[in-house]
Amino acid sequence: VDNPVIYVAIIVAVIVGAMFLNRGLRRSVSKSGSRYGRRTTDDRVNGILAELAATIVIHAPEPAAREVLDRVVLQQPRKFSLLDDGGYGIRFVEADDAVVRLVDDAEGTRMQVVRTTERLGMPQNLEFWRELRSRVTSGAEAQAISVADGPQHSFVRHDGNPVYWEITHESS
């Protein structure tokens, strides 16, 4: 087998085979990476929504609960805002990226997120919501008002500009 044409043909076949194998391998790896990324993002979004769905019940009438919440919001104007419609905003970029409302509850007044804006591919405002719940709990307890965890609710996603998540169902 002293013919160099055979060696050249084998080398060309290996190069062409490697090109086709490389494309298929790249495509397969890309699909696997995309699936993993979507799964990871979905898990993070579900975790964030579960925590944003957590409510607290302030064992006081709405005016007393509003007084506690107003005081907390006014102390942190860069994080929280009073909205014209009586709700409260949690700021990520805009003053109302998440909207918090006080709702009558059988045990007093429930504080809950009713809408949150999606930025950077997922709902934001989780840290500020945690802080708001903590500060309201401390403020209420300082006035001898008890606070308890309230019912969870769920959200539905609305596409648009911007994308937002809105409360759909309150569970007891």
Residue spans for each PLM region:
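Proline-rich intrinsically disordered, low-complexity coils
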Residues: 4, 61-63, 77, 123, ...
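N-terminal signal-anchor transmembrane alpha helix of single-pass membrane proteins
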Residues: 1-38
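A sequence-composition feature that detects small, non-aromatic residues
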Residues: 9, 13, 18, 50-54, ...
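Cytosol-/stroma-facing membrane-proximal "stalk/adaptor" domains immediately downstream
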Residues: 85-172
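N-terminal topogenic membrane-targeting module
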Residues: 24-93
